[in-house]
Amino acid sequence: MLHLTKPQKETIYMKITRVLLAALFLVTPLMFFTDLTENPFQVQNTVLYVLLALIYATMAVKFLRSKTIDFTKTFFDLAFFVYVIVCAVTWLSAVSSEPQALRQTMFYNMLNYGTLLLVVALGAYVVSKNVVFSGVIESKTNYILLFIVWGALWLLLPYLHTMLSADNLFARMFDWYAVLLWAAGIWLGMRVLKKVTQENIIVLVFISVFLACVYGVLQALGLEFLWPFEMSQFASKAFSTFGNPNFLSSAVVMLLPAIAVYFLRAESKKDMLVYGFLTLVYLLYLSFGLARSCWLGAACGFIMMWMFGSLRSLVWGRRLRAFLLILLAFGVLYGSAYFGGSKSPVAARAEELSQVTPSNFTLDVDKDHIFQSLHQRLFMWDVSKEIFLSRPVMGAGLGNFQMAFAQNQYKTLLKHPNLRELKARTNAPHNEVFFQLAQGGIVGVGLFLFMFMVLFLEVKDFASHKKEGDKKQLLQAVFCGILGMLVDNMLNISLHAVVPAFIFWWFVGAEVSGVGKEDRTVAITVNPVTKTVGLAVLAFCGAVIVWQGLVLCSYFRGYEGLKLQASGQVKEAQANYARALALYPANTEAGLRLGNTYLQEHDYKNALTAYEKTLSAAAYYDEVYFNAALAALGAGEEEKAVRYLTEHLKLSPFNLRAYVMLGSLIRQDVIYANDDNLKLLDRGVHLFPYAAELWTTLGDIYVKRDETEFAKNLYKRGLTADTLDRTLLQNLKRLYKKTQEELPPIAAQAQRIQDLHVKAANYWSQSVSGRRKLRTDIEAYIKDFPNDTNGPVLLALYFNQAGNALKSKELLEGVLKEHPEDLSANLALSSLLYRAEQTQDAVYYLKSALFYYPENLTATKRLAALGKK
């Protein structure tokens, strides 16, 4: 936008810009409230958006007043701007192809997620590429030491904390002591940025990330001092001020190569000690953060440093210093893994990688061998592939990944039912290439890869032709940080978190302006067109500030409602939820909770209104659809209940209760029995073959529709799945009697085993010879029908009553080895183990039964009874 290097006579616009830049790089990463919003980093997001908007507003006013402005033109601009434009086009393409009901949701998708690219990424890049590299690394260690003192002063906050009496957002955020500290910090930041150069901005980033790392290390050691009450749920976790250890770890990955260059080029012992200390703290936090993808990213960044000849010669020239740092780094990393004489979470986290083997690197995995970190990612990548296949050219559209993920994950779940508990709502799949493929299709991922290929080639050319020096080595280190971040985001989502994404795109802008040809500027003067653009930028900045204010107030009110609800003040909670939803309709959690409170009070109409308002902004939220169906049912609106249940089951295919409810509604009024709904119910009996009520309900629907043959086939399928279901057998007999046809073989088979089951249940009333005959008959049945698991289960029951628990257990384990979803076998084996006082194993099989049949009454009651003992 303009060269931001401080001129000889500083203008008011430059002063304002320096203040905003100091706040942007210092306040944003460190401002952290856990008692304002449920998502602790929501305040950070708002502050960053507002500060970026203010910087652009300042530049726009400067342009309108001074009548001229200079843009720095770089080799990267065309590729990046084309990528941004194409992303916007993908959103328009998606909107035009989706039904009207989804378009409001897609608008909020753009606000929630699309603006990360359009505001944060683009905004950071454009400002950054207009800040120059001076070519000189100045000593700023005095300021770093002052900032360490400044950070230590925050230890006094719990003792000097003040709070205004009013109960609003401003009063909760305001604190006189904190205001003084922030003012002092921004003033120090302005001193660091006395010359606004990339080198000085990098130092300011060093400082803020270092202070965040120190706080995170203290948290990991259990020394929480700022938020002792609100942070209790984060005990021994290094969340720091980024709200997520992965996000701060990603920032560390980007900074490690650069701070290594500062350390190696330090001319004084003081500089060497300070930068060395910062490096060790970064490494310590990286270890405590437990983010393995960041460990990989950092390793790749360091390996890339060794690939550059100038950095290699720098390391070799300062090899004694480098060796000492490496030695200390290994000591720090080893100490973090084995401090206190025992293995820490760091070592345990590293050892978990041994669970990743070629045999389980697949989605076809048994539920007991699911490795969460691995299979959650494999699952999300497979869903991303499904999104891409549904729209291969333009993808789901900018900002629409979360919606598309919710709409497509059922495909993967149905192919791999053992992964049902990995079902998720996410805005990124922990792999940036899959994200770009799903969001932008072939066009989007192609432009994304091309964009960074252009950067990599330019860096290669720069490394080959430029002379040695501070600028060259620092730019190569920044590039290594960018590469490390990209590697990290092959398994992480920090590029979709506001603060690390901002730092990343700032570094990209810095790298682009540094390695490209110098003095390539475009002067723009005021004319009717450019003036209109300037005014539009100013209006857009104002809109961003207002929007972010509404978002923050909404999430504040939503969190207040949650705390009031937890304390039993339901009416006050409802008022806060309603205000939150009115301020920002895309606050889906507030809308869901508002509806839930009304639903608990049996106020079905208000509950339905709240749910429907929430769905208008989040038409992919399966839980809201289900609860809306309950509310509609209570309000007597069966048509809406059916519609919401069908939408829910499209998104969440393993909700047995929803299938049963839908079937009951359709049985009551077969007008709702269209092909789509019948297909859903048929899918339900396929997924839950032991759900007798579901088979019966669907059969009754076919009978009511005079589709007797469909009903017959359904009952036969049901009996094939569970030959012990008496209701299905009776219904099948009744239909065949009505049509005077001969009963099918499955009926005779079911009657045979049901008769045997009655005899087995009356085992103790039979004679010895009768018991022997019963065993012979059961074994004959198993021989005749080896694929029916009810045979071995019944034989296991016989042996258990005969006192041979070992044989009974062997039979049941054999059934479950081949058919782990068998409900009868799971329940029978849990009872057997409980009587053998093997409670832990009994609990396992009860949980297994509930995994395949959620809310099964027998398993739920037994598990609850075991939990009390």
Language-model features and meaning:
Residues 335-351, 530-568:
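Hydrophobic alpha-helical transmembrane segments in integral membrane proteins
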Residues 579-580, 613-614, 647-648, 683-684, ...:
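Canonical positions in the second alpha-helix
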Residues 554-557, 588-589, 604, 621-623, ...:
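Helix-start (N-cap) detector for alpha-helical repeat units in TPR-like alpha-solenoids
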Residues 566, 600, 634, 668-669, ...:
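Register position in tetratricopeptide repeats
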Residues 2-3, 8-9, 15-31, 49-60, ...:
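Alpha-helical transmembrane segments of multi-pass inner-membrane proteins
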Residues 224-239, 343-383, 387-389, 398-438:
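Interfacial juxtamembrane loops and adjacent helix segments
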